[in-house]
């Protein structure tokens, strides 16, 4: 017998055991997250709001090279908001150099008189001084005071820069007046009519509010179905448990997020040097004692209709996750245990990489077991059986939640069944293998310090028919 023939069985057994242990650890993380309590915003309290109980809300709408039709669909939903008209404003914040989008928004202002426009100038403009002054006096803006990009004013041209300018400019306008809430959404985000009312209720109990999300075009293409399931499994099922009575670090989702303006000023605003701002700002709020509340009635958004566009979106998420979980955690003052708990948020996504090993070695193990030529110790088969049972139970929970939530955007049982068919366990296994691509690209973006330019997720106004039905 050659050395190769002697070593191969041991190597296969070792790889099988490794994959099963990793799956077991991933299941343990899931169990921990699902065991955490959820702090829901109680919408039954809306009726208790008096005339003075509606905080002023500024809703920022950052856009970049967007279709006018997509923005019209979003603005149609914003026009149906149920909130005192003198207690909120909607402010579109395109880059000043994005002349096509600015022109589209100016045309849309004729249809939607509530829409205000704040073009964001280059950082060389004198109006940015309000930002530099705020950061100079606030050590919580650690990126401005320490590190290789300290005091660099040439901020990367992406959504975060637009939010930074709009936020501090608005704070300066409100100086000496009442505190207010800020909310921001994406170009395609269509909030429900009670979106702002939920904020008025929730902010009485919590410091940060996060609205859940759901895809409206989930049956548009197979790729859209798979992309939408990410939101079903994360935004709609697992994410709410991060509220956890303040026990667990949390991220925010980057749309439908409410902060008190005074809190965001105190804690330094948004970090401009990360691919996405959502994870870092949420964890900075958590480590400074701000509690999270979850708004159940979701924003309706559009997911990419092709795999390549979905990979582009997800590689940016992954890069931002790695960036946010590195030096920022120490800069914001997290202990080692707190940093460990922060990493647990990313592990369910990162554990998808185990499939690169687990699926092929699992196929081999199953084949040899059925062929009665298995060389695996009996206890490893028991471990695998436990993992399979845990996986089946997890899928059952996901499908039950998906069936319930899909009713929000699909009008018939047939359409909902069709969606469940498109995300069956076999197809999900394929999709989770595809996830290896953005995981790898996103990791390389993190290692090489890329992702500072906004790679827009292209929207095609896929939700217009749905929103025409819902907004009447």
Can you describe what each PLM-predicted range is?
Residues 1-76:
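N-proximal low-complexity "stem/linker" segments adjacent to membrane-targeting elements
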Residues 56-58, 89, 280:
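Cell-envelope/extracellular polymer assembly enzymes that use nucleotide-activated donors
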Residues 94-110, 121-129:
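A conserved acidic beta->alpha catalytic loop
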Residues 283-300:
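Catalytic donor-sugar/metal-binding loop of nucleotide-sugar-dependent glycosyltransferases
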Residues 75-87, 111:
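Short, acidic, metal-binding catalytic loop of nucleotide-sugar glycosyltransferases
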Residues 175-190:
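Short beta-strand-to-loop acidic/aromatic patch adjacent to the donor-nucleotide binding site
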Residues 25-56, 330-342, 371-472:
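Juxtamembrane C-terminal module of membrane proteins
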Residues 118-119, 126-176, 193-274, 311, ...:
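Long helical/loop segments within the catalytic core of UDP-sugar-dependent glycosyltransferases
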């Amino acid at each position: 017998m050659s050395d190769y023939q002697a070593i191969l069985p041991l190597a296969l057994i070792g790889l099988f055991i490794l994959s099963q242990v990793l799956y077991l650890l991933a299941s343990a993380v899931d169990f921990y997250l699902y065991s955490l309590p959820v702090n829901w915003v109680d919408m039954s309290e809306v009726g208790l709001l008096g005339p003075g109980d509606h905080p002023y809300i500024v809703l920022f709408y950052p856009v970049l090279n967007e279709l006018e039709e997509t923005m019209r669909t979003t603005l149609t939903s914003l026009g149906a908001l149920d909130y005192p008209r003198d207690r909120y404003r909607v402010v579109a914040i395109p880059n000043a150099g994005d002349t096509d989008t600015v022109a589209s928004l100016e045309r849309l202002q004729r249809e939607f008189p509530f829409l205000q426009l704040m073009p964001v100038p280059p950082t060389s403009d004198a109006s940015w001084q309000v930002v530099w002054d705020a950061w100079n006096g606030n050590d919580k803006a650690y990126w401005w005071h320490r590190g290789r990009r300290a005091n660099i004013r040439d901020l990367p041209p992406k959504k975060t820069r637009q939010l930074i300018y709009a936020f501090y400019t608005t704070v300066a306008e409100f100086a000496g007046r009442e505190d207010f809430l800020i909310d921001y959404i994406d170009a395609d985000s269509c909030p429900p009519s009670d979106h702002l009312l939920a904020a008025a209720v929730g902010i009485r109990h919590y410091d940060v509010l996060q609205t859940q999300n759901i895809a409206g075009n989930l049956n548009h293409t197979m790729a859209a179905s798979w992309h939408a399931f990410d939101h079903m499994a994360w935004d709609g099922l697992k994410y709410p448990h991060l509220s956890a009575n303040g026990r667990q670090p949390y991220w925010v989702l980057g749309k439908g997020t409410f902060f008190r303006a005074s809190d965001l000023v105190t804690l330094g605003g948004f970090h401009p040097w990360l691919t996405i701002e959502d994870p870092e700002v949420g964890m900075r709020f958590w480590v400074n004692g701000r509690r999270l509340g979850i708004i159940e009635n979701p924003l309706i958004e559009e997911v990419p209709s092709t795999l390549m566009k979905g990979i582009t979106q997800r590689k940016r998420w992954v890069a931002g996750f790695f960036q946010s979980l590195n030096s920022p955690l120490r800069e914001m003052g997290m202990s080692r245990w707190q940093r460990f708990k922060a990493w647990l948020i990313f592990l369910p996504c990162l554990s998808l990489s185990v499939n690169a090993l687990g699926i092929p070695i699992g196929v081999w193990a199953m084949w040899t077991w059925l062929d009665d030529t298995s060389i695996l110790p009996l206890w490893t088969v028991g471990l695998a059986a436990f993992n399979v049972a845990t996986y089946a139970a997890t899928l059952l929970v996901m499908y039950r939640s998906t069936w319930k939530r899909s009713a929000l955007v699909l009008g018939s049982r047939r359409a909902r069944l069709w969606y469940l068919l498109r995300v069956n366990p076999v197809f999900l296994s394929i999709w989770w293998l595809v996830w290896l691509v953005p995981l790898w690209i996103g990791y390389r973006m993190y290692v090489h310090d890329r992702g500072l330019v906004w790679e827009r997720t292209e929207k095609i106004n896929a939700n217009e028919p749905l929103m025409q039905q819902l907004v009447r």
